[in-house]
Amino acid sequence: MSLFLRKRCLCLGFLLFHLLSQVSASLRCPSRCPPKCPSISPTCAPGVRSVLDGCSCCPVCARQRGESCSEMRPCDQSSGLYCDRSADPNNQTGICMVPEGDNCVFDGVIYRNGEKFEPNCQYFCTCRDGQIGCLPRCQLDVLLPGPDCPAPRKVAVPGECCEKWTCGSDEQGTQGTLGGLALPAYRPEATVGVEVSDSSINCIEQTTEWSACSKSCGMGVSTRVTNRNRQCEMVKQTRLCIVRPCEQEPEEVTDKKGKKCLRTKKSLKAIHLQFENCTSLYTYKPRFCGVCSDGRCCTPHNTKTIQVEFQCLPGEIIKKPVMVIGTCTCYSNCPQNNEAFLQDLELKTSRGEI
C-alpha cells in the first residue's frame, strides 16, 4: 500500500472516530448545560408533549413507544414509558417500552395490563399493573340541582343506566324530575345555551354548562362539551378553576339563617396563579367562595372564563382558560372530591359492586 493510501485511510479512520465520539457525546448529559437553549421550541407530532431532556437543560419532544431513547432523549413518562437499554453494552441508547405489569382479575375475568373494560354501564375501568382504576359515567355528584330545588333526591329512570335528580317529595319521582337533566353547580355563562349558528353552515350550536371544579380547594379543572367550531363537532373543553385556597382560614359564621355564602376577602396583594410547574405571567386578585352558616356547600354561582398566560419551561409561554368567580351560593348536595370518590370506589370494588 502506498504512502498516500495509508495517510488517506488514517485520516478517514480519525474522522470516523471523531464522528462516533460526537454521536456518543450527544447521547449523554454534558458536564454543563448550554448557556442558551434554541429560541424556538421543538415542533412535536400531534399528541406528543414537550419535556425537558434527561439532563434538565432544554425542551425536547418526548420519545414514544418503540422509538430510540437516551439521556438526552427521554421517553414520555406520562404514558408510563421507560428507556430499556439492556441491548446496549454501553448502556447509552435504548428503546421506549411499557413495563410489563401484572394482570387484573375482576368478577372472574382476567384483564391484561393496560386493558380497558366496562364492568357495567356506570363505570369505565382500566387495568394498570395489577390494580383496577375506574371512572364514573354518571356525573350526579358533579351535576347538582339548582338552589331553588326543594328536597333533591336521586331516582331511577326506566330504561336508563344513570339515576336522575328530582325535586319535591312525590313518590314516583316523575313530576319533579329536572327534564331528565341535572343542573350543574355553575350557572350558564353568556356563551352557554342552544342557539342557531350561521345558516350557511347549517349547524345548531350546542354548549353544555361547566362542570363543578374537580377540587374543593386549590387548583382543579372544570369541563364542558361544545360544538362551537367550524366543523360543528362536539369536543370537550377544560378550564382551570380554584374555588378556594387550601390554606384558607375558616371564617367566623355570623349569619344564623344560613341563606348566604360568606364570601372570603380578596387577597390584600395580587398573587400569581400556579398549576403543575407553570406560573402566570401577571398577578391577579381572585374572588373565592367561603362557607355556609348552616353547613351546606358554598360553590360558584356565576362565573366567567378568561385566558391567562403561563410560563412553564424557560422561554415557553402558554395560554390556559381560567374560571373567574362572580358570585357563590349554598347547595345541599355537595360535589365529591377525587379522594372521596376513590375511597368510595375502592370500597365498592372490594365488595364486588362494580
Curated annotation (Swiss-Prot):
Gene3D superfamilies registered for this protein in UniProt: Complement Module, domain 1 (2.10.70.10), Thrombospondin type-1 (TSP1) repeat (2.20.100.10)
Signal peptide: 1-21
Residues in TSP type-1 domain copies: 202-247
Entry's induction text: Expression is reduced in atherosclerosis progression.
Glycan-modified residues: 91, 277
Cited SMART domains: CT, IB, TSP1, VWC
Biological-process GO terms, alphabetical: angiogenesis; bone regeneration; cell adhesion mediated by integrin; cell chemotaxis; chondrocyte differentiation; endothelial cell chemotaxis; endothelial cell-cell adhesion; fibroblast migration
GO MF annotations in UniProt: growth factor activity; hormone activity; integrin binding; Notch binding
Mutation effect (residue 246 to A): Reduces extracellular secretion. No significant effect on axonal growth of callosal projections when overexpressed
Keywords: Cell junction, Cytoplasm, Disulfide bond, Gap junction, Glycoprotein, Growth factor, Hormone, Lipoprotein, Palmitate, Secreted, Signal
Family annotation (SUPFAM superfamilies): FnI-like domain, Growth factor receptor domain, TSP-1 type 1 repeat
Subcellular location: Secreted; Cytoplasm; Cell junction, Gap junction
Recorded consequence of changing residue 229 to Q: No effect on extracellular secretion
Post-translational modifications reported in the UniProt record: May be palmitoylated on Cys-241, which is important for extracellular secretion.
Family annotation (InterPro entries): CCN (IPR050941), Cys_knot_C (IPR006207), Glyco_hormone_CN (IPR006208), Growth_fac_rcpt_cys_sf (IPR009030), IGFBP-like (IPR000867), IGFBP_CNN (IPR012395), Insulin_GF-bd_Cys-rich_CS (IPR017891), TSP1_CCN (IPR043973)
Domain VWFC: 102-168
Disulfide bond sites: 29-55, 33-57, 37-58, 44-61, 69-83, 75-96, 261-298, 278-312, 289-328, 292-330, 297-334
IGFBP N-terminal domain boundaries: 25-99
Function: Immediate-early protein playing a role in various cellular processes including proliferation, adhesion, migration, differentiation and survival. Acts by binding to integrins or membrane receptors such as NOTCH1. Essential regulator of hematopoietic stem and progenitor cell function. Inhibits myogenic differentiation through the activation of Notch-signaling pathway. Inhibits vascular smooth muscle cells proliferation by increasing expression of cell-cycle regulators such as CDKN2B or CDKN1A independently of TGFB1 signaling.
Protein name: CCN family member 3
